[in-house]
Protein backbone atom coordinates (compact mmCIF):
# COMPACT_ATOMS: atom_id res chain seq x y z
CA UNK A 1 0.00 0.00 0.00
CA UNK A 2 1.39 3.41 -0.91
CA UNK A 3 1.83 6.07 1.74
CA UNK A 4 -0.09 9.34 1.61
CA UNK A 5 2.25 12.31 1.93
CA UNK A 6 1.35 15.95 2.46
CA UNK A 7 3.78 18.86 2.65
CA UNK A 8 4.20 22.08 4.57
CA UNK A 9 6.27 24.93 3.21
CA UNK A 10 7.64 26.99 6.09
CA UNK A 11 7.29 30.71 5.39
CA UNK A 12 6.54 31.84 8.92
CA UNK A 13 9.81 33.48 9.95
CA UNK A 14 10.79 37.11 10.35
CA UNK A 15 13.62 37.05 7.76
CA UNK A 16 15.84 39.41 9.76
CA UNK A 17 18.86 38.80 7.48
CA UNK A 18 16.75 39.76 4.45
CA UNK A 19 16.00 43.15 5.96
CA UNK A 20 12.61 41.89 7.13
CA UNK A 21 11.41 41.13 3.59
CA UNK A 22 9.10 38.11 3.54
CA UNK A 23 11.46 35.55 1.97
CA UNK A 24 8.79 33.44 0.35
CA UNK A 25 7.49 36.46 -1.56
CA UNK A 26 10.87 37.84 -2.64
CA UNK A 27 11.17 37.50 -6.41
CA UNK A 28 13.79 35.25 -7.93
CA UNK A 29 14.00 35.36 -11.72
CA UNK A 30 10.52 36.84 -12.02
CA UNK A 31 8.69 34.49 -9.64
CA UNK A 32 8.15 34.49 -5.89
CA UNK A 33 10.66 32.28 -4.09
CA UNK A 34 7.88 30.06 -2.75
CA UNK A 35 6.61 29.42 -6.29
CA UNK A 36 9.93 27.75 -7.16
CA UNK A 37 9.56 25.57 -4.05
CA UNK A 38 5.94 24.70 -4.88
CA UNK A 39 6.91 23.70 -8.42
CA UNK A 40 9.57 21.32 -7.07
CA UNK A 41 7.44 19.52 -4.49
CA UNK A 42 3.92 19.59 -5.95
CA UNK A 43 4.38 16.45 -8.12
CA UNK A 44 5.74 14.57 -5.09
CA UNK A 45 2.91 15.09 -2.55
CA UNK A 46 -0.88 14.98 -2.23
CA UNK A 47 -1.61 18.28 -0.46
CA UNK A 48 0.48 21.37 0.26
CA UNK A 49 0.08 23.64 3.27
CA UNK A 50 1.81 27.02 3.52
CA UNK A 51 2.83 28.10 7.03
CA UNK A 52 2.86 31.91 7.15
CA UNK A 53 2.52 34.39 10.00
CA UNK A 54 2.22 37.53 7.85
CA UNK A 55 1.07 38.30 4.31
CA UNK A 56 -1.35 35.37 4.53
CA UNK A 57 -3.61 36.81 1.81
CA UNK A 58 -0.71 36.98 -0.63
CA UNK A 59 0.32 33.41 0.16
CA UNK A 60 -3.26 32.23 -0.37
CA UNK A 61 -3.00 33.46 -3.98
CA UNK A 62 -0.80 30.42 -4.72
CA UNK A 63 -3.90 28.24 -4.31
CA UNK A 64 -3.03 26.28 -1.17
CA UNK A 65 -4.28 26.36 2.42
CA UNK A 66 -2.38 28.90 4.52
CA UNK A 67 -1.90 28.13 8.22
CA UNK A 68 -0.46 30.38 10.94
CA UNK A 69 1.43 29.17 14.01
CA UNK A 70 -0.88 28.12 16.82
CA UNK A 71 1.97 29.12 19.19
CA UNK A 72 2.34 32.88 18.72
CA UNK A 73 5.50 34.98 18.93
CA UNK A 74 7.58 33.76 15.96
CA UNK A 75 8.94 30.72 17.82
CA UNK A 76 10.73 29.26 14.81
CA UNK A 77 10.20 26.32 12.48
CA UNK A 78 9.00 23.91 15.18
CA UNK A 79 5.89 26.06 15.69
CA UNK A 80 5.01 25.84 12.00
CA UNK A 81 5.61 22.09 11.93
CA UNK A 82 3.39 21.53 14.98
CA UNK A 83 0.56 23.48 13.37
CA UNK A 84 0.89 21.57 10.09
CA UNK A 85 1.03 18.20 11.86
CA UNK A 86 -2.34 19.03 13.40
CA UNK A 87 -3.83 19.85 9.98
CA UNK A 88 -3.01 16.65 8.10
CA UNK A 89 -4.24 13.08 8.21
CA UNK A 90 -1.48 11.87 5.88
CA UNK A 91 0.89 9.06 6.81
CA UNK A 92 3.87 11.41 6.44
CA UNK A 93 4.48 15.14 6.31
CA UNK A 94 7.22 16.63 4.16
CA UNK A 95 8.69 19.80 5.68
CA UNK A 96 10.60 22.26 3.48
CA UNK A 97 11.58 25.93 3.78
CA UNK A 98 10.17 28.53 1.39
CA UNK A 99 13.61 29.67 0.22
CA UNK A 100 15.09 26.50 -1.34
CA UNK A 101 14.21 26.84 -5.03
CA UNK A 102 16.43 23.95 -6.16
CA UNK A 103 14.95 21.18 -3.99
CA UNK A 104 15.41 17.68 -5.45
CA UNK A 105 12.63 16.46 -7.71
CA UNK A 106 13.19 13.02 -6.13
CA UNK A 107 13.17 14.30 -2.53
CA UNK A 108 10.09 12.41 -1.32
CA UNK A 109 10.75 8.98 -2.86
CA UNK A 110 14.30 8.89 -1.55
CA UNK A 111 13.41 10.06 1.94
CA UNK A 112 10.46 7.66 2.14
CA UNK A 113 12.66 4.77 1.02
CA UNK A 114 15.20 5.70 3.72
CA UNK A 115 12.51 5.73 6.42
CA UNK A 116 11.14 2.36 5.33
CA UNK A 117 14.58 0.75 5.03
CA UNK A 118 15.42 1.68 8.64
CA UNK A 119 11.87 1.54 10.04
CA UNK A 120 12.53 5.11 11.21
CA UNK A 121 10.11 7.86 12.23
CA UNK A 122 11.92 10.74 10.53
CA UNK A 123 14.15 11.24 7.50
CA UNK A 124 16.45 14.25 7.43
CA UNK A 125 17.96 15.46 4.17
CA UNK A 126 21.69 16.10 3.87
CA UNK A 127 23.73 17.78 1.16
CA UNK A 128 26.40 15.14 1.76
CA UNK A 129 28.19 17.31 4.29
CA UNK A 130 25.54 18.91 6.50
CA UNK A 131 22.13 17.83 7.70
CA UNK A 132 19.28 20.14 6.64
CA UNK A 133 17.15 20.33 9.81
CA UNK A 134 14.14 21.92 8.08
CA UNK A 135 14.03 19.45 5.19
CA UNK A 136 12.31 16.49 6.83
CA UNK A 137 9.88 13.69 6.17
CA UNK A 138 8.17 12.73 9.41
CA UNK A 139 5.18 11.03 10.92
CA UNK A 140 2.50 13.52 12.05
CA UNK A 141 1.92 11.29 15.09
CA UNK A 142 5.11 12.84 16.55
CA UNK A 143 3.22 16.11 17.10
CA UNK A 144 2.79 15.70 20.87
CA UNK A 145 6.52 15.08 21.31
CA UNK A 146 7.38 18.18 19.28
CA UNK A 147 4.80 20.29 21.10
CA UNK A 148 6.16 19.28 24.53
CA UNK A 149 9.70 20.04 23.33
CA UNK A 150 8.70 23.54 22.13
CA UNK A 151 6.67 24.28 25.25
CA UNK A 152 9.71 23.34 27.37
CA UNK A 153 11.48 26.31 25.77
CA UNK A 154 13.46 24.37 23.18
CA UNK A 155 13.76 25.70 19.61
CA UNK A 156 16.34 23.60 17.74
CA UNK A 157 14.82 21.17 15.26
CA UNK A 158 17.90 18.91 15.22
CA UNK A 159 17.84 18.58 19.02
CA UNK A 160 14.23 17.43 18.75
CA UNK A 161 14.70 14.81 16.05
CA UNK A 162 17.81 13.47 17.79
CA UNK A 163 15.40 12.17 20.47
CA UNK A 164 13.71 9.93 17.87
CA UNK A 165 14.63 7.17 15.46
CA UNK A 166 15.77 9.18 12.45
CA UNK A 167 17.72 8.45 9.31
CA UNK A 168 19.78 10.83 7.16
CA UNK A 169 19.32 10.68 3.40
CA UNK A 170 22.24 12.18 1.48
CA UNK A 171 21.67 14.18 -1.69
CA UNK A 172 25.39 14.65 -2.36
CA UNK A 173 24.60 13.92 -6.02
CA UNK A 174 22.73 17.27 -6.07
CA UNK A 175 25.12 19.63 -4.24
CA UNK A 176 23.04 22.79 -4.81
CA UNK A 177 19.69 21.24 -3.87
CA UNK A 178 19.47 22.93 -0.48
CA UNK A 179 21.02 26.29 -1.28
CA UNK A 180 18.78 28.85 0.36
CA UNK A 181 18.46 32.59 0.52
CA UNK A 182 19.15 34.46 3.74
CA UNK A 183 20.70 37.64 2.36
CA UNK A 184 20.25 39.79 -0.75
CA UNK A 185 23.74 38.69 -1.87
CA UNK A 186 22.77 35.01 -1.71
CA UNK A 187 19.66 35.81 -3.73
CA UNK A 188 21.77 37.39 -6.46
CA UNK A 189 24.13 34.38 -6.61
CA UNK A 190 21.21 31.94 -6.73
CA UNK A 191 19.50 33.86 -9.53
CA UNK A 192 22.68 33.43 -11.59
CA UNK A 193 22.79 29.70 -10.72
CA UNK A 194 19.21 29.14 -11.88
CA UNK A 195 19.79 30.85 -15.23
CA UNK A 196 22.83 28.66 -16.03
From Swiss-Prot:
Residues that bind GTP: 10-12, 23, 51, 69, 99
UniProt entry keywords in alphabetical sequence: Cytoplasm, GTP-binding, Magnesium, Metal-binding, Molybdenum cofactor biosynthesis, Nucleotide-binding, Transferase
Xref: InterPro entries: MobA-like_NTP_Trfase, Molybde_CF_guanTrfase, Nucleotide-diphossugar_trans
Protein name in the entry: Molybdenum cofactor guanylyltransferase
Role of this protein: Transfers a GMP moiety from GTP to Mo-molybdopterin (Mo-MPT) cofactor (Moco or molybdenum cofactor) to form Mo-molybdopterin guanine dinucleotide (Mo-MGD) cofactor.
Gene: mobA
Cell compartment(s), UniProt: Cytoplasm
Quaternary structure note: Monomer.
GO BP term, example: bis(molybdopterin guanine dinucleotide)molybdenum biosynthetic process
Domain notes: The N-terminal domain determines nucleotide recognition and specific binding, while the C-terminal domain determines the specific binding to the target protein.
Superkingdom in the source lineage: Bacteria
The organism of origin for this protein: Shewanella baltica (strain OS155 / ATCC BAA-1091)
Record family assignment: Belongs to the MobA family.
Enzyme class name: transferase
A cellular component term, taken from the record's GO annotations: cytoplasm
EC number, UniProt record: 2.7.7.77
UniProt keyword Translocase present: no
A single GO molecular function term of this UniProt record: molybdenum cofactor guanylyltransferase activity
Main localization (coarse): cytoplasm
Cofactor: Mg(2+)
SUPFAM superfamilies noted in UniProt: Nucleotide-diphospho-sugar transferases
